[in-house]
Design a protein with these regions (language model features):
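Intrinsic-disorder/low-complexity detector
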Residues: 1-74
Length: 74
């Protein structure tokens, strides 16, 4: 059986990174990313994302949730 390993761009501010961060901080699923670094560049929201970007965000969110590693707020 052939399996294709999908690799995502994990740069800070990218779709995968933002999905991962949202899940880590227990924020709701809300696809977005930043054109450059998080919070210091233009934000791209769901309506303006490509299918591949949404897939990357979703993968980051899912992977982080599956890891079981979340921010401890205590």
């Amino acid at each position: 059986m052939n399996q294709t390993l999908v690799q995502y761009d994990t740069r800070h501010g990218g779709a995968y990174d933002r999905g991962s961060a949202d899940a880590y901080y227990r924020r709701s699923y809300n696809p977005h990313y930043y054109r450059g670094d998080s919070y210091s560049s233009a934000r791209v929201d769901l309506a303006d994302m490509t299918a591949d970007e949404i897939t990357a965000y979703t993968a980051g969110y899912r992977d982080q949730e599956e890891s079981g590693d979340f921010k401890d707020w205590d």
